[in-house]
């Protein structure tokens, strides 16, 4: 149906859609004008009959309201409704801001159609989008689908989230920002103007440069925001204020409480997780018409974890989470523990020193506590060192190595220490395994005159004890097993001095007492049994004792108890076969000491065995302290040994005050 221009009947004018601007030609009003309307709905099919538009009767004022449109066909009504309602924001929120933050050059006016009587649709329409694309790409920044509101030649693509909030919504701020759910009890602060602007701009940057890192995007956004003028920032400031009010409605009791930043190490800093504007790029082909999957302001809502892309526009943790979800277990653990096999751990293995230190290792510094051999337990080594000087003991290893066959009596089959079976089990790869066999091949030295002076010093303490089980080398100290402590041994009379600290007897080293173990039958079961050899190091101990003899002058019986220095002889050194009492000269008093009592020498049966004698009838005087007094006409200095006076807990300085002895002068040696 074609309307003629000179039609006499008056038809009602066309009702315009809000936001459109009618274009009136600058010709005479009598001629009809063709109106071009920009539409977003699909173009009609080719076989459909084009509907006619009645001519527009201009009024003197262009802003006059047109009259209502007459009734049309159902197809025409559907087309008009699609053209009138293009976005829910235009209806739901009449106060939707028309922002002009980014003014663009006005589009070139579309060419008007010729002066024909028929109205044809514009040929500049975009291809009709699909329903899923219409629902999923309502954000204003999607290319090719911008919703334009033409008003006075200014185009704008800004539609904020506050315009999409339903009137009766209980969560208006969450609906406006489409924020994701956080941990329970955590409420995010309302977005400021920069966050509103950067959320929309980030989406555009990610579309142009999808490989750009988040940190670089943030720097670029900050630089651009500083370059914007106040007028350009005004729409975002208004939107931020609206979001703040919506935030107050949703969270009425919210109060911002900033928390102190925790000090973190550089390696523990989490990557930036602000990737809301870089997502949902791969969701455009999803045929989901639900409103919960709408992308508003460049963000996505439901199902975002399963639809993350691996673009670097997103946070660095997204790709890491995807790698973890893929089941990749090829990563190395944080700590690697190196475990040794059971064959490498053997508690019975002992690493022996080299060949030059083997003798010194066994006889000078260390003592074998339990040295076990084969099943017969036939040979043992009892290395009980004597109490000789320390400086002579350092050369013991070399001496024993040179003259060992002399002490063994020339028996080539004897061995020192552990038997060959135990040596082969404990030290199979040691090059010193055959050292003992080579020592036995040395010819014995039977003539003692050929021995050096150094060897002769050790002969009194060495004993060759031949037995049926074999030869045993014993290095014993005098009376080691008889008494817990030894008698002092003086070298000569010249070495006796008054100061006990300077005497060699005060510098004696206590003998090493080995922890001897017997070989029982269960410990020596078979040839294949190997036992762990234990060694013990006994540190030398030095006991220092100062003895001061105070001899006061005068007294009641000073007439017959006055002695001179020439009346005394030097106290000789006690030999091994002499009495244990060092007071053995003719002019010295024959007084012995037993416990805390003085006894006469005639009552002493054996001076070396005080504990086995009975001195009940011979006790001169008994004292329990250190001030000892003895009634004796032949009084002299009482020399007490280390055994006679054990160390007292009060100290090592012992003072003996013999008030009963009267001397003409102090006696000093």
Swiss-Prot record:
Keywords: DNA-binding, Nucleus, Transcription, Transcription regulation. It holds the Pfam family HMG_box. PROSITE patterns: HMG_BOX_2. SMART domains: HMG. GO terms for molecular function: DNA binding, bending; DNA-binding transcription activator activity, RNA polymerase II-specific; RNA polymerase II cis-regulatory region sequence-specific DNA binding; sequence-specific DNA binding. It comes from the Eukaryota. Residues 187-255 bind DNA. The keyword Transcription applies. GO terms for biological process: brain development; dendrite morphogenesis; metamorphosis; negative regulation of transcription by RNA polymerase II; neuron differentiation; neuron remodeling; positive regulation of neuron remodeling; positive regulation of transcription by RNA polymerase II. Residues 1-149, 254-336, 419-439 are annotated as: Disordered. It is found in: Nucleus. Its main location: nucleus. Residues 52-71 have a biased composition (Pro residues). Residues 17-37, 88-105, 284-294 have a biased composition (Low complexity). One of its GO terms (cellular component) is nucleus. Residues 1-12, 75-84, 295-318, 419-431 have a biased composition (Polar residues). InterPro entries: HMG_box_dom, HMG_box_dom_sf, SRY-related_HMG-box_TF-like. Residues 130-145, 322-336 have a biased composition (Basic and acidic residues). PANTHER family: SOX TRANSCRIPTION FACTOR (PTHR10270), TRANSCRIPTION FACTOR SOX-14-RELATED (PTHR10270:SF323). This is Putative transcription factor SOX-14. It comes from Drosophila melanogaster.
